[in-house]
């Protein structure tokens, strides 16, 4: 019996020696190479790492250093200096579902072509990582990313999974060519719906904060968005600048606030903009609203040859159209003031009271062509119910027949200036007088 006991003891000691030898061998470069080769040869993935570290002070954690992981024949999905895998008792029933995974000092590529990771975690943590999404609808590049995803259950084309809570911060981020710094995002993913409970960032020398939701059909609901002290320069025309708004099925704006911001493009600019918008839904090239409101003022607005100073606009939106409560601006040395309504039915703009005073306006060289050109679909008719003009100067520098009218005054009522998308004086009455005029270099008084 003593002999059998000794044999069992020797066998046990030998097994322990082999186990410990194998344990320490796995933590060498030789062990890392063999594990990497075994995974690469027996799966559809390629894996490399320099060394695996395990410490008895943290027995539930495995540490991999200088890790590269991805699908065979494709660029690496993950490159990280350190991967810390937290194990739990779950590994007895689900070996590929771990407690935590910490990715540190590396790059994670997210795209629809990305192959699914073969493992899951209750929590994925990122520390000083870079995120890229090449080839996806959201062109994303982020650096110095920290945060977490809970739970993390990646699928094909969805590195973050189908349902998870997200909390991320980034030192710098570029989304669809728009750069930002000090970014904070808190929200959730529920299949194709993305909820952004908190969004904050520094961008264009200003700040952005908001709450938004992306629905499964690709439409957006912006509950609240604030832009403060933005100084943005763009190389896009005004129509190109707003073109992304027409690419989504719809954009519902609950509340938009813009404060002390300046935007500039190649042929347009607005400075010192303050804007407040409520309850407006944009759908392709149309809009809908229930009790919507717009208040806006700026120091300067430029669009092509149009140059407005100190414009003020207050309007209300409804299913019937737009109630223009106030529009005032300084233009061409004078003042323009009006109010009225745009009616969706008939696409008619009716201005109740329009006043133009102190204008010094030189007609553009192609004003005759502009006069004959059809107007946009949204403007079928224009009627001035009440009109007044005071001390205006109008000049035409056409060398074939130059003319100018000085100190032009006038008033009118029910003037229909647009009919069927065409300029003209179609109906109404008006009285005009001037202190002096010159027609083809002939003075008239």
What are these regions (language model features)?
Residues 19-115, 152, 175-180, 206-208, ...:
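Terminal hydrophobic membrane-targeting helix
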Residues 212-240, 338-368:
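Long amphipathic alpha-helical scaffold regions
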Residues 86-91, 171-172, 196-199, 241-247, ...:
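Short, recurring structural edge motifs at helix starts
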Residues 179-184, 193-200, 206-209, 237-243, ...:
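A cross-kingdom feature marking solvent-exposed beta-strand/loop segments within repeated
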Residues 1-17:
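N-terminal Sec-pathway targeting helices
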Residues 89, 99-190, 195, 203, ...:
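Elongated, acidic membrane-bridging lipid-handling scaffolds
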Residues 62, 194, 208, 220, ...:
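Hydrophobic residues embedded in beta-strands of well-ordered beta-sheets
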